[in-house]
Amino acid sequence: MIKKSEKLVITFYTTTSAMAMEKICKECGADGRIIPVPGSISADCGLAWCAKNESEDALLALMVQHNITPQGIYHCLV
């Protein structure tokens, strides 16, 4: 079993926003990947962006630049 570690988890209101985040992050080489929303978090969309905690500032700036609105930003075991 893979050991869980604390990660940054960003949830979204819509699947479209989650997919836009994935596309932009891949284009920019930003850290992270799409995951199912962890059971400890409630969100409108079932997809979330998971990345290292250290990536938070860069990812938030990227979302502002591309008009992506997060539903929630969490630090949890994934």
What does each model-identified segment do?
Residues 15-17, 39-40, 56:
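Short Gly/Pro-enriched loop/turn and capping motifs at secondary-structure junctions
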Residues 1-2, 34-41:
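Short, flexible, solvent-exposed loop/turn segments with mixed acidic/basic and small polar residues
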Residues 2-11:
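Short glycine-/aliphatic-rich beta-strand segments at the starts of folded cytosolic domains
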Residues 50-78:
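C-terminal structural segments of small proteins and small subunits
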Residues 31-37, 71-72:
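A short linear hydrophobic-aromatic micro-motif
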Residues 10-13, 51:
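Small/polar loops that bind or transfer phosphate-bearing groups
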Residues 42-47:
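Surface-exposed aromatic
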Residues 13-31:
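Short amphipathic alpha-helix segments
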